[in-house]
Amino acid sequence: MNTRRARLAAALLTTAVALTGCGSSGSGAAEVPDGWGTLRTKGVDVSYPKGYAQQSAAERGKHNAAAAVRTEGGRKVSVITVQLGFTEAASAEQAAIAAEAGIQLGAKVRGQKDVELAGADEAKRIDFSFAATGEDGGPAKGTPVEGVILTGLDSSDTAFAIRVDAARGTLPEADLDRIIDSVEVH
């Protein structure tokens, strides 16, 4: 009888150890919808919906490792950017504080929360909104813009920030969710 209990205990322990590796630790594979493009960088990848165009190094801002833009009527209505090493941070919380500091003056920050990103031990999401300035080919002055920043540390402990800005009504919530689900940190 003791041998049976020992075997049962060993089997249960083995199962428990195997299951410990399962679950949502952020290490699962990212989900990329069919037909979407992907911004690939050395620290993080993120996909974008049809209708966006990836910018070359010459077109995007010098601090952006990658960017994709959606235009309507000759104006940018949505931009997705990836920044790497934008700050020295030892945690996702520190990276989020630095990312928040980079949001446009006068923006309404609605807070930050934990978010699961494939490959990340921890990550933060910051939601905010602001009125467009009308500059740099963006939405007309005063247009409400919704923004989200996803931030954390990649596998080499380099801070990353993925920023999605979209004029209100130009990026469906379902597509924003798919963008977030597509993120893969490496």
Regions picked out by a protein language model, each given a short descriptive name:
Residues 1-12:
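Bacterial N-terminal signal peptides that target proteins for export
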Residues 32-38, 63-66, 120-129:
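Short, hydrophobic/aromatic-rich segments at coil-to-beta transitions
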Residues 52, 158-186:
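Surface-exposed amphipathic alpha-helical segments
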Residues 95-96, 100, 146, 173-180:
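Extracytoplasmic/secreted envelope proteins and their assembly/folding machinery
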